[in-house]
Amino acid sequence: MSLCIKLLHETQGHIVTMELENGSTYRGKLIEAEDNMNCQMRDISVTARDGRVSHLDQVYIRGSHIRFLIVPDMLRNAPMFKVGPGRSVPLPTRGRR
């Protein structure tokens, strides 16, 4: 299982933001995430591409429709990102430091 999928499973129970391929943004509590990134969320605020905001109680999003995810900052300290025995350097990340 990849690091990204492990991180997605760690976010279960937390508030996440997802942008879909169609440009809409979903922000709510992640209830369940599958290995293929299919996600179930509750108490969602949906922002359409044109800026309209609506509310949904529950939604199931197909993983192949997700463009990107924004996860809580507190997961920055998740154990999977720590340098462990046999690993001399932290895992590479994208972007600047």
UniProtKB/Swiss-Prot annotation:
Main localization (coarse): nucleus
Q: Which InterPro entries match?
A: LSm4/Sm_D1/D3, LSM_dom_sf, Sm, Sm_dom_euk/arc, SmD3
- Gene Ontology MF terms in the entry: mRNA binding; RNA binding
For this record, an example GO cellular component is:
U4 snRNP
UniProt key word Ribonucleoprotein: yes
The processes (GO biological process) annotated in the record are: mRNA 5'-splice site recognition; mRNA cis splicing, via spliceosome; spliceosomal snRNP assembly
Per the record, a Pfam family?
LSM
Q: Where in the cell is it found?
A: Nucleus; Cytoplasm, Cytosol
In this entry, which stretches build a coiled coil?
Answer: none
Where the record annotates domain Sm, the positions are 3-75
Is this entry keyworded Nucleus? yes
Top-level taxon in the UniProt lineage: Eukaryota
Function statement: Plays a role in pre-mRNA splicing as a core component of the spliceosomal U1, U2, U4 and U5 small nuclear ribonucleoproteins (snRNPs), the building blocks of the spliceosome.
List, alphabetically, the PANTHER family matched. Answer: SMALL NUCLEAR RIBONUCLEOPROTEIN SM (PTHR23338)
| Subunit record text | Belongs to the 40S cdc5-associated complex (or cwf complex), a spliceosome sub-complex reminiscent of a late-stage spliceosome composed of the U2, U5 and U6 snRNAs and at least brr2, cdc5, cwf2/prp3, cwf3/syf1, cwf4/syf3, cwf5/ecm2, spp42/cwf6, cwf7/spf27, cwf8, cwf9, cwf10, cwf11, cwf12, prp45/cwf13, cwf14, cwf15, cwf16, cwf17, cwf18, cwf19, cwf20, cwf21, cwf22, cwf23, cwf24, cwf25, cwf26, cyp7/cwf27, cwf28, cwf29/ist3, lea1, msl1, prp5/cwf1, prp10, prp12/sap130, prp17, prp22, sap61, sap62, sap114, sap145, slu7, smb1, smd1, smd3, smf1, smg1 and syf2.
User: Family per UniProt?
Assistant: Belongs to the snRNP core protein family.
What protein is this chain from?
Small nuclear ribonucleoprotein Sm D3
Q: Which organism is it from?
A: Schizosaccharomyces pombe (strain 972 / ATCC 24843) (Fission yeast)
